[in-house]
Amino acid sequence: RRKKAAAKTHMRLNVGTMLPAFAVVEDAAHHDSKRADALCAGLKDGDVLLADRAYVDFLFLHGLAARGIFFVLREKENMDFEVLEERQHPDRRILKDQTIRLRGKLTADKYPEPLRRVTAVVEVDGRDTEMTFISNNFAWSPRTVAELYRARWVIESFFKELKQTLQLADFVGYNENAVKWQVWVGLLAHLLLRFLKHVSKWGLSFSRLAGVVRSAVWMKIDLLDALRKYGTAGGPKRPVIVEKQLYFQGFEPFSSRPVG
């Protein structure tokens, strides 16, 4: 019988390299916004934060803006605001481009400056979906705001890749420390596989790479050389099993039995 185990990984993923820059692994009871400060502590002036609406904490976002950091996040549905300016755009997929100010009792004091609000039609899994974003950058085109948020979805691909190739859905232990250690080991294994992919110039899928390394890890071979040659004429030959090894003595085929 499988037991239930829950762990939450908060991660800052570099969209350009698809590599984790910072991670926090903890039990699933904490809300995402509680770890936002730790995740973004290493961001610098001019960096761009792309995050889900779970990280919409206006005091936190105001702190980012004060540090010169830009952000693009999904709007919370219950956000209370007034429209200061509305801009028209010829792009039919841009439905709204507004300058707004928060007026909610719990939000107006936390972020007193104007915000950018963009509503756009975005393709999600092959289907058009209307989405609304908030940002503190007024220089970007509204299409850029929408496309930047789409880039955030690489983290979904990252976790899908992590779960599928390293089998993080099943745990050996189920207490808090056991689950945390297994997630950390999975992240480290993923990092090592990405390093192997880079140095070997691996051109096939990541799942194929994980499968090859998994099958070769106990073999005495030059792993990098094997990965570089994999799928080519110079690749490692498959081991050949001698036919005689498949039979007990006295039960060999007649062609294999000793004469005399």
Where are these regions (language model features)?
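Single, function-defining residue in the core of a domain
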Residues: 1-260
